[in-house]
């Protein structure tokens, strides 16, 4: 998504290599608010039919989990990237829980998550709590329940429904900004996600700090994309999170 970081900023006050991310001393949080669990999977070759079946099943299995209040089954761009070419094996499951206890039970004891583990070539699980949010996703708004972090890692989500009449203008402007995101200093994880080809897209990224994320938001490619993106979206949502835990492997990099 082209205008992820500047809009997310406005929502607040204005042997793979290992990641340094650690949740041994998670940030302090206030009671209440949603907790996100994001599953990122690269489906094993022997489990391709199971992987395709995730889109047939949709969000029904996830919404049957205790405490789950909103869910989206998502595809990704090729190799987890941001282009128009879809990936045949990489996908995501986005689930919002009413509290952290429900999120932890889902990660630790859910048969759905265990099924993901059994069928994965790679699996990365992110747990995070929003500290600022603007906009909606299919009419749903995130409940904020965490203070803004003083330091440490942050995550950002942007999603949008692209107006069909503007898709031909959106995608040429999206490419340079999104390609630069993966290479940006301080970006630990970045993935392009989507509900529907071309028109319902999202980006999720994790950063070393707010400063690193804001520095990327001021880069030339990103700023040009922001200017070009006006009036592209019929609905959008921009969220910043405090990451509570990241564990697993994504695109060859180990987290946790």
From Swiss-Prot:
Catalysed reactions, as listed in the record: spheroidene + 4 reduced [2Fe-2S]-[ferredoxin] + 2 O2 + 4 H(+) = spheroiden-2-one + 4 oxidized [2Fe-2S]-[ferredoxin] + 3 H2O; spirilloxanthin + 4 reduced [2Fe-2S]-[ferredoxin] + 2 O2 + 4 H(+) = 2-oxospirilloxanthin + 4 oxidized [2Fe-2S]-[ferredoxin] + 3 H2O; 2-oxospirilloxanthin + 4 reduced [2Fe-2S]-[ferredoxin] + 2 O2 + 4 H(+) = 2,2'-dioxospirilloxanthin + 4 oxidized [2Fe-2S]-[ferredoxin] + 3 H2O; spheroidene + 2 reduced [2Fe-2S]-[ferredoxin] + O2 + 2 H(+) = 2-hydroxyspheroidene + 2 oxidized [2Fe-2S]-[ferredoxin] + H2O
Any GO molecular function: metal ion binding
Compositional bias of kind Low complexity: 1-23
Cofactor: heme
Disulfide-linked positions: none
UniProt enzyme class: oxidoreductase
EC annotation from Swiss-Prot or TrEMBL: 1.14.15.9
Alphabetic keyword roster: Carotenoid biosynthesis, Heme, Iron, Metal-binding, Monooxygenase, Oxidoreductase
Family per similarity comment: Belongs to the CrtA family.
Its job: Involved in the biosynthesis of the carotenoids spheroidene and spirilloxanthin.
Protein name, per record: Spheroidene monooxygenase
Organism the protein comes from: Rubrivivax gelatinosus
